[in-house]
Amino acid sequence: MGDRAQIAVKQGEGRIYLYSHWDGAGVYKKLADALVFGKSRWSDEEYLTRIIFQKMTGDNKDTTGYGIGLNRHNDIEHDIPVLDCDSQTIDWEDRSGSPTGTKQSFADFSVQTFETD
């Protein structure tokens, strides 16, 4: 089972996917927190990707639960934010990878509030 989610960060022509197996419902808040913390790195996809992943994993020391990859998973349970550091925007894709037509700036997304358990 699980509560699977991914965050994608554009890297050149490709993407890096950050994966959470158990915390899908909390991923958007963690992304917003990472954008607030990493505001000085919004234009640097390497540093911002690391900051986001660090916020996702927290102090987790397990060998499972989180991952980094080059592909979208087929069993994701939440829409996928796709970050573009060049334009500092987030495009959204549904769980199948199709664009939803929603676009947000990093600034707008980072000030949203999210319900948490």
Question: Where are the regions a protein language model picked out?
Answer:
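Short, solvent-exposed aromatic-acidic interface loops
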Residues: 17-29
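Low-complexity intrinsically disordered segments
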Residues: 34-117
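Short acidic-glycine loop/turn motifs at beta-strand connectors
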Residues: 10-14, 85-87
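Residues that act as N-cap/strand-start positions at coil-to-secondary-structure junctions
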Residues: 1-3, 75
